Amino acid sequence: MTSVDVQLPRCQRLIPLPLLESPLSGRQSAALAALFDSASRGEAEQCALDTIQQEMERLPQGTRRLAVQLRMELDPAWLWAVLTDYANLSRFIPNLEISRLLWRRANVVGLEQVGAQSFMGMRFKARVELELTEHPQEQRLSFTMNKGDFRRFEGAWQIGHDASGTTLLYELTVQGCVGMPIALIEQRLREDLAANLRAVQQEALRRAAAC
C-alpha cells in the first residue's frame, strides 16, 4: 500500500487506508469514517467543521482507491435529498455533464453519468452506467459499474451524524482501461472528489436556506 505524498493543510493530511474489500460494506464505510475521526482527534486540536480529509491508495494494475470526507453542520436529511436527486446532479456537480435515471426497482436504481474534463487544450469524456443501492436507514448509497469506460468503478456515499456535526464520506475504487493515462486520472480524481463534496454541501445548504 502506498500513500500519496501531497501537501495538505491541517485536517486534510493523508491517513493510511486499511486494506478492505471493495465495494465497502456499510460496516466498513462506517469504520473508514471512524478512522478519519480518530486521526483528527490525534491532532493537537480536533478538526473544525467545514474541513476536508482525504486519502488515496495505489493498488496493482493501475487501480486507485480514494476516500474523501467533509465535516459540516447540516441536517443529514438535506444531504440525502441532494444525493438521491439523480436527474439533477449534473446541475451542480462540476464536470458532470449528464446524470440520467434509467430505471428503479425498489431501493435499487440504474443511473447513466457522463463526465468531461479539459486537459492541455483537449476535452476528454467518460461514461458509466451505475447500479446504486439505497440504504436510507444507514444513510448510505453504494454503487457499482455495470458498463462504461473503466474496468472498475465502484464505491459508496456515507452520511454520518453525531454531537460534533455531520459528515459526508465518499469512497471510490477506480481502474482505468488499457491505454488510459493513470497518472492523469489520479491527479484529476484527487482534485475533483473534494470539489464534488463541496458541491453537494453547497446545494444542500441552498435548499435548506430556501425553506
Where are these regions (language model features)?
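Hydrophobic/aromatic beta-strand elements that line small-molecule binding cavities or substrate pockets
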Residues: 67-70, 99-100, 126-134, 154-161
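Solvent-exposed residues in well-ordered beta-strands and their adjoining turns
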Residues: 71-75, 114-118, 133-135, 146, ...
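Hydrophobic ligand-binding cavity/cleft-lining segments
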Residues: 2-107
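Glycine-rich portal/gate segments that line the openings of hydrophobic small-molecule binding cavities
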Residues: 56-62, 90, 100-147, 199-211
